[in-house]
Amino acid sequence: MELNLSEPGQSRYLRVYEYYKELIGSGQMKPGAKLPSIRKCSLQLQLSRTTVETAYMLLAADGYIISRPQSGFYVTDAVLAAANREEIEHGVPHQEERPEIRYDFASSNVDRESFQFDLWRRYVKSALRQDERLLSYGEPQGEREFREALCAYLGRHRNVICTPDSIVVGAGVQSLLHILCPMLRERDSAWFFNPSFRQGRQIFEDYGFRTGDIREYWENNDRRIESSKKGLFGIEKPDVCATEMKTGLSEQMSEAMRHTGKSVCYLTPSQMTVWGEVMPVGDRMKLLKDAAREDMLIIEDDYNSEFRYYNRPTPSLQGLSGGRGVVYLGTFSRLLLPSIRMSYMVLPPDLLKRYQERGRFYNQTASKAEQIALCQFIRDGHLESQIRKSKKLYAAKAKCLCDAVRRIFGEKARTHLGDAGFLVLMELDSPLTSAEIAGRAAQAGVAVRPVESVGSLLEKQEHHFQEGYPKLLLSCASMGAERYEEALEVLKEVVYKKEK
């Protein structure tokens, strides 16, 4: 670029500015290069010192050069950052727009009809009127009154053994795991039975834990299969003798833990699969016995425990253990609204002592106003009423979805209902894979979740899953039941359009 000062139309200081800006931006002047002094530049260009000084000040203001006292002006490293920023802002590849989803069978949202917004609004307004309480920060462990209400509720409904002092409140399970993991330094590995909670697993990895999948370990380390049979959880195990018990989670876990030292086991016994299989009491007791023998800490995420449609809720592992050796986690995201970020953790005595030594260093992440509101909401009995209403609604919607599948697909599809949760498993008679169907459905505006293998499902005797048949998980939660049939008609067209 040549500096032309004779053309009219632009101030001379701007031309000097543009000239050096181009030299620096193009790399002809490298970071650290020295510019001519103001006096020398004014002589070379035959300009006044004021004109050159103004141009230099503008370059410095924009980050291209820096003034060093008693030394002069130098090109800055910020130029490289500016170039990188421009490349990032303008060089990002165009992302293909996703198709609009009209029918959402994959959402984890809740049904609007399941929640009494006006009632909750009343409790929030009442909490916001407590001016004096809201002028201070919340208690690091959670508001005392809220923990007292939680303690009473958990004891009544989940047989959890706790006191208000053993409960820690946080904004979501992940925030609580960030408190828990540093207290488990003597344990070096964390095992997960259900790999779908990737966010939790990532936190353990971030804190240096080796993580593994119990099911995968079992399958990769037992190659002695001669005559085999399906175990209680769908895992093949050698038939050592004719009277051998079916292989359950406890056996799989004990075998894995026996070779890994002091470990942590993270599981959701009230929803062992995404579609709602529940760990039986017998397996829970066996697991607790083996965990005590192997010095294994269990983290029980009691997700969706309230949503047992057809049977009474199974007692929590924490309660069955007598309150020792188990960390109990719970959340209100499904019972209330996902946007109400309120979770809680019940610590066993040994970990509670550690928390009390360092708990003051943690700030409370959950809203103080929402804790106050939810405390009174629970005390007035509305949480239990909310559970009854939600269970009735989602049980009816799940049945409605199964009926709609039968009407639309006939003998070309089968449905399976789990013991809990919001999902219906659908098996299709089609040569397409689950992923292919999900991809085509998305293009047609229908969101579904593919299931790639029977191994990811816990198999009960009443369910006979077929290998080779595509399987989809359909959520009955967020979409209105009146739209099920029209959505399934679109899905059927996607699956069988080649057969016409």
Predicted regions and their residues:
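Short glycine/serine/threonine/alanine-rich loop segments
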Residues: 47, 64, 209, 296, ...
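Short glycine-rich anion-binding loops that position phosphate/pyrophosphate groups of nucleotides
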Residues: 110, 269-272, 334, 479
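Conserved core of the PLP fold type I
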Residues: 134-294, 299, 305-307, 312-324, ...
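Active-site PLP attachment segment
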Residues: 70, 319-354
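N-terminal basic, amphipathic alpha-helical segments
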Residues: 1-125, 132-135, 148, 231-237, ...
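Short beta-strand "wing" residues that participate in macromolecule-binding interfaces
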Residues: 66-68, 162, 448
